[in-house]
Curated annotation (Swiss-Prot):
Keywords: Autocatalytic cleavage, Cytoplasm, Decarboxylase, Lyase, Pantothenate biosynthesis, Pyruvate, Schiff base, Zymogen. Substrate binds at T58, G74, G75, A76. Pathway: Cofactor biosynthesis; (R)-pantothenate biosynthesis; beta-alanine from L-aspartate: step 1/1. Its EC number is 4.1.1.11. This is Aspartate 1-decarboxylase. It comes from Gloeothece citriformis (strain PCC 7424) (Cyanothece sp. (strain PCC 7424)). Heterooctamer of four alpha and four beta subunits.
């Protein structure tokens, strides 16, 4: 059936804390955010700047844990300024027939003004019984920074 790219991780409305033109490249992100959604260091990400509409791709570099750091570096720093809101997406390539048979899972963080977790979602594609399609489900695990009573919360 062929390969498709599906979003597997998203950091929604994270705020740029610094923009460093002098760095060689990438975007530096608090590793606690990366770990929560499953983005790896050096993984390619697509980024949308909600303040100016600019889009770009780069790779991720882990910053200091717990700081909420989101710092575009190098050329990417010219597309952002401190305070801008970004959406950062990571994709994985999957075989379409595999997704129709096994489903797909993505993790999404919606950040607060300090880049802490305001909301956390697990979004899943669940195969239909016929194996010819999928249904989409979005489960909110954290609301307003507080865990909801949900068994999925224990997953990383």
């Amino acid at each position: 059936m062929g390969k498709i790219r599906l979003m597997h991780a998203k950091l929604h409305r994270v705020r740029v804390t610094e923009a460093n033109v002098g760095y060689i490249g990438s975007i530096t992100i608090d590793p606690q955010l990366l770990d929560r959604v499953g983005i790896l260091p050096l993984e390619e990400v697509d980024i949308v700047n909600l303040n100016n509409g600019k889009r770009f791709s780069t790779y991720v570099f882990p910053g200091e844990a717990g700081t909420g750091e989101v710092c575009p570096n190098g050329g990417a720093a010219l597309l952002c300024q401190p305070g801008d809101l970004l959406i950062i997406y990571a994709y994985e390539e999957r075989d379409r027939s595999e997704v129709l048979q096994q489903g797909h899972h993505a993790r999404v963080i919606v950040a607060d003004e300090n880049n802490q977790i305001k909301q956390f979602f697990h979004q899943t594609l669940i195969p239909t019984e016929e194996g010819k399609g999928v249904s989409f489900h979005s489960d909110e695990i954290i609301l307003n920074g507080q865990p909801k009573n949900n068994p999925i919360l224990s997953e990383n």
